Amino acid sequence: MEITLFDPIDAHLHVRENALLKAVLGYSSEPFSAAVIMPNLSKPLIDTPTTLEYEEEILNHSSNFKPLMSLYFNDGLTLEELQCAKEKGVRFLKLYPKGMTTNAQNGTSDLLGEKTLEVLENAQKLGFILCIHAEQTGFCLDKEFLCHSVLETFALSFPKLKIIIEHLSDWRSIALIEKHDNLYATLTLHHISMTLDDLLGGSLNPHCFCKPLIKTKKDQERLLSLALKAHPKISFGSDSAPHFISKKHSANIPAGIFSAPILLPALCELFEKHNALENLQAFISDNAKTIYGLENLPSKKARLSKKPFMIPTHTLCLNEKIAILRGGETLSWNLQEIA
């Protein structure tokens, strides 16, 4: 059995920087046609020049791949700055509530503040797409739910602004997407295939720790259902986020799951298991093209066959190891060729 996926798109990707970027980028740039690149670096991408420098770094270490760049939402994003970014091809804003995830210490503290709303108004005028890490301070399993009032305010106040709830993790958010025409979402492999049991049901597994947290069986099943039917307001976004094992095994574990090396085979296995392989093309590419208005992307054909694939336990960077999701397991699908 074989399947060919055309122009796979990852609508949420972390490729880090410097040596780590060189070590992990190929896992995404080779099989994927394009990816929305996250701006939460150690020095956030808060303006157009730094964003373009990072884009150049990615392009210098990849080929036939389109990085879709995003700006780190901040109060300094004036109308002039946004116009400059748009002229240079930057179409995405990423809003991080302050302190909610990795490198979000410079995030937005007042989500409904005057300055935040002013930036959003300008973003709407210029046709930007807003991607949001939709969590608010509160009990860890309710953080996304607690952000619903903010999301509703954004959706109603800026009806022409496309708003993406990144890495949807709570089944209660589904109703919001179906209620508001301008609300969309991305789904990760881990949120549609894993639950809290994978993180802490046995021994604590730091390599399954991410934000937003993987949640209950009900959440996983409801979100998986959206993916399997390729809901038209949902696109695939891996949120693949590599960290060194030395940091993952520390007393202060960073959030992030490195899933890039297994994405296409694992999705094939999951969709075949649920008799939904015919919908994988829409989930992995077609929906994103429609939602984000993507055209003239590099052409890619990823051919996968139903043959065993033993997942490596890790990859290397500067003699440090980076653990790969489900490392040591065997998938029933294998990526055979990229053309």
From Swiss-Prot:
Keyword Zinc: yes
Protein origin, superkingdom: Bacteria
GO biological process, one term: 'de novo' pyrimidine nucleobase biosynthetic process
Active-site residues, Swiss-Prot/TrEMBL: 239
Modified residues (N6-carboxylysine): 94
Metabolic or biological pathway, per its Swiss-Prot or TrEMBL entry: Pyrimidine metabolism; UMP biosynthesis via de novo pathway; (S)-dihydroorotate from bicarbonate: step 3/3
InterPro entries associated with the record: DHOdimr (IPR004721), Dihydroorotase_CS (IPR002195), Metal_Hydrolase (IPR032466)
GO cellular component assignments: cytoplasm; cytosol
EC number: 3.5.2.3
PROSITE patterns according to UniProt: DIHYDROOROTASE_1, DIHYDROOROTASE_2
Cofactor note: Binds 2 Zn(2+) ions per subunit.
Cofactor or coenzyme needed: Zn(2+)
Residues given in the record as Zn(2+) 1 binding sites: 12, 14, 94, 239
Job of this protein: Catalyzes the reversible cyclization of carbamoyl aspartate to dihydroorotate.
Subunit structure: Homodimer.
Family: Belongs to the metallo-dependent hydrolases superfamily. DHOase family. Class II DHOase subfamily.
HAMAP family: PyrC_classII (MF_00219)
Protein name: Dihydroorotase
